[in-house]
């Protein structure tokens, strides 16, 4: 289809029931949401028709999840409004959304243990019998009635802990229907279930659609969009791009809408003379997580890893660093086979690993900058005859902080008090102190401001000039394209392609990432 036809307005779906006095069951009008230093949503609008499946598409960080959390009452918009059945509503908490008829099934399912299926569905709404006691027989009867309506084959008295991910999703759907919801939001519902389970889920979604429920379906998988969605909307960089009928577009049209921007000039890539292969990975696998992952990284080379949420990129990084070791395949460093079963072994082999979640698995928040920086080297360069060379360590830590331009009153400042960008610089400084041969960076600029991003990109380039082999995982395609010599693309635990810098572009990467 032509680019001109991509922007055509969506016509009314003739299959939608017409016995209502409103056209849209849910509307979001001119919503803006800001977080410190970030505009997550910029004047966004969205309309959901009753009796349709409406998919939301966009790169990671496009604003989809933020918008859904506003609709579900988790966040409140700074500007704009939400309308339900044509009337403005104020959703100050998730319970407000539930009572208004909006239910959300999160990617991380929120069912409670140790409780039964029925107890989870009717929590805080349990039917009461004589003397105000919970009527368990009635609760079971209501649950079974729900399951019969939805064609769900589960025991209402089963413990949640005994259920598969797919079965737990069915419980979440039944719970949503029990609120008589008019709107059901589903966030990546097929990310952890089998093809057979997906088929069953789609049957239930079609049944809910036939009952007039408006379903908002967040997905990265284009085949699902064409199979289950009536229409879809695309978001990019916190902005609404457009809404279209699924039957009117091609896969290439959608990719073009999702990635329609040029790489920013803040990602300059300097040419570096590449050396020998430092890291060689062959058929690396971990059962149920990733399989047969192979790639090489040369001295001075930056190899970017691209892929959608759940593609397995971070799992590969954790395996390389011994956080969650692989159970198959081989790793070579400078031509020698190595076994890495722990982070300490990885550090001894010259590896460094910047994790994707600096607050949870990176920073030691109650400790000082000095203590955070020195934490990786206490058993490395600065230990001599059982004693830590404290003066030498402190001196180099200060030099690194100055080099990275960490904004802080002093080395004794608690890292929790720093901005996200400065925390990230400290974590990079921690690994620079180990003088690594291999640097693995997982989302190195996530959640930091533009200025700090540029400084970190410059630092990565400097390390490449010094011969460090860099593996960089990023969900930002401009960052991947702007910084990488080669791009490894993953999808559902496997490598779907490796692109040289000259041939890589956003459309090719998204095509490989969505296979």
UniProtKB/Swiss-Prot annotation:
One of its GO terms (cellular component) is plasma membrane. It comes from Hahella chejuensis (strain KCTC 2396). It is a peripheral membrane protein. It is found in: Cell inner membrane. Keywords: ATP-binding, Cell inner membrane, Cell membrane, Membrane, Nucleotide-binding, Repeat, Sugar transport, Translocase, Transport. PROSITE patterns: ABC_TRANSPORTER_1, ABC_TRANSPORTER_2, MGLA, RBSA. Its EC number is 7.5.2.11, 7.5.2.7. ATP binds at residues 58-65. Residues 26-262, 272-511 form the ABC transporter domain. Pfam families: ABC_tran. GO terms for molecular function: ABC-type D-ribose transporter activity; ATP binding; ATP hydrolysis activity. This is Putative ribose/galactose/methyl galactoside import ATP-binding protein.
């Amino acid at each position: 289809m032509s680019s001109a036809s991509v922007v055509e307005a969506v016509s009314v779906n003739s299959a939608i029931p017409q016995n209502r006095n409103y056209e849209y069951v849910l509307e979001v009008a001119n919503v803006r949401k800001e977080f410190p230093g970030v505009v997550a949503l910029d004047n966004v609008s969205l309309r959901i028709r009753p009796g349709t499946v409406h998919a939301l598409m966009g790169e990671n960080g496009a604003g989809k999840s933020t918008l859904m959390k506003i609709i579900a009452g988790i966040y409140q918009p700074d500007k704009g409004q939400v309308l339900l059945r044509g009337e403005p509503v104020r959703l100050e908490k998730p319970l407000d959304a539930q009572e208004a008829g909006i239910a959300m099934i999160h990617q991380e399912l929120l069912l409670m243990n140790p409780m039964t299926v029925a107890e989870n569905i009717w929590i805080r709404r349990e039917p009461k019998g004589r003397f105000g006691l919970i009527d368990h027989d009635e609760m079971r009867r209501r649950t079974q009635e729900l399951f019969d309506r939805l064609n769900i084959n589960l025991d209402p008295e089963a413990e949640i802990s005994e259920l598969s991910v797919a079965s737990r999703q069915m419980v979440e759907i039944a719970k949503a229907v029990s609120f008589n919801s008019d709107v059901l939001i589903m966030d990546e519902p097929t990310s952890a279930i089998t093809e057979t389970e997906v088929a069953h889920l789609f049957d239930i979604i079609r049944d809910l659609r036939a009952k007039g429920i408006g379903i908002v379906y967040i997905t990265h998988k284009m085949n699902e969009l064409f199979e289950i969605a009536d229409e879809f909307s695309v978001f990019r960089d916190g902005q609404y791009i457009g809404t279209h009928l699924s039957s009117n577009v091609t896969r290439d049209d959608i990719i073009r809408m999702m990635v329609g921007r040029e790489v920013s000039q803040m990602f300059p890539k300097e040419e570096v003379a590449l050396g020998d292969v430092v890291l060689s990975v062959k058929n690396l696998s971990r059962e149920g997580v990733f399989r047969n992952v192979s790639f090489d990284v040369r001295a001075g080379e930056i190899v970017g890893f691209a892929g959608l949420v759940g593609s397995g990129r971070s799992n590969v990084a954790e395996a390389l660093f011994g956080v969650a070791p692989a159970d198959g395949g081989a790793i070579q460093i400078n031509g020698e086979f190595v076994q890495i079963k722990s982070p300490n072994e990885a550090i001894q082999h010259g590896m460094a690993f910047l994790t994707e979640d600096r607050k949870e698995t990176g920073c030691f928040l109650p400790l000082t900058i000095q203590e955070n920086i020195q934490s990786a080297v206490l058993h490395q360069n600065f230990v001599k005859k059982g004693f830590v060379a404290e003066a030498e360590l402190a001196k180099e830590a200060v030099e690194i902080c100055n080099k990275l331009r960490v904004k802080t009153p002093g080395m004794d400042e608690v890292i929790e008090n720093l901005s996200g960008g400065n925390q990230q610089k400290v974590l990079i400084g921690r690994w620079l102190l180990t003088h690594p041969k291999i640097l693995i960076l997982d989302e190195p600029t996530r959640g930091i401001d533009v200025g700090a991003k540029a400084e970190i990109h410059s630092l990565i380039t400097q390390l490449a000039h010094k011969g460090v082999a860099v593996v960089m995982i990023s969900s930002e395609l401009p960052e991947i394209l702007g910084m990488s010599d080669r791009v490894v693309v993953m999808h559902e635990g496997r490598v779907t392609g490796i692109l040289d810098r000259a041939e890589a572009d956003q459309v090719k990467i998204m095509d490989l990432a969505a296979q």
